[in-house]
């Protein structure tokens, strides 16, 4: 990207796309890091792969990431706006998971370690959703020149 900036002298739109891409790379890298953290917890054996509590949250988060990348590829600000709105759904899933796990721990103290692992996974999914929102916000910036704070 730096070579492109120096050699091609991009105009405003090109410069916005380059700077937005650089910002998105950071968010995509963090998504990968958090996916790795989720995998480590699952591999540790404390969590069943098909844990019902997290299935819908995971699906919503994966959808957000996919749509944010699609919005970038297609320069689709409407899809980016949709991703931003979907963050409330993932935040709602996190709250439900958290409250369910608190109830589990109070009724069955032996569930403590497993519940903490599930809560960590839920928090990682919630953060992945936040990074998908960041990508969507940078899509809007790259197309319109306006940076939408979420």
What label would you give each PLM region?
Residues 1-150:
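Cytosolic, long alpha-helical scaffolding segments
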């Amino acid at each position: 990207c730096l070579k492109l900036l120096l050699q091609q002298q991009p105009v405003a739109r090109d410069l916005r796309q380059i700077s937005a891409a650089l910002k998105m790379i950071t968010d995509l890298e963090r998504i990968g890091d958090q996916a790795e953290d989720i995998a480590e917890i699952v591999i540790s054996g404390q969590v069943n792969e098909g844990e019902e509590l997290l299935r819908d949250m995971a699906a919503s988060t994966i959808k957000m990431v996919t749509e944010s990348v699609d919005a970038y590829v297609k320069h689709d600000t409407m899809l980016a706006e949709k991703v931003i709105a979907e963050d409330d759904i993932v935040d709602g899933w996190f709250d439900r998971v958290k409250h369910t796990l608190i109830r589990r721990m109070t009724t069955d103290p032996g569930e403590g370690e497993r519940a903490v692992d599930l809560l960590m996974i839920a928090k990682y999914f919630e953060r992945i959703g936040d990074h998908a929102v960041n990508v969507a916000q940078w899509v809007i910036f790259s197309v319109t020149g306006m940076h939408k704070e979420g």
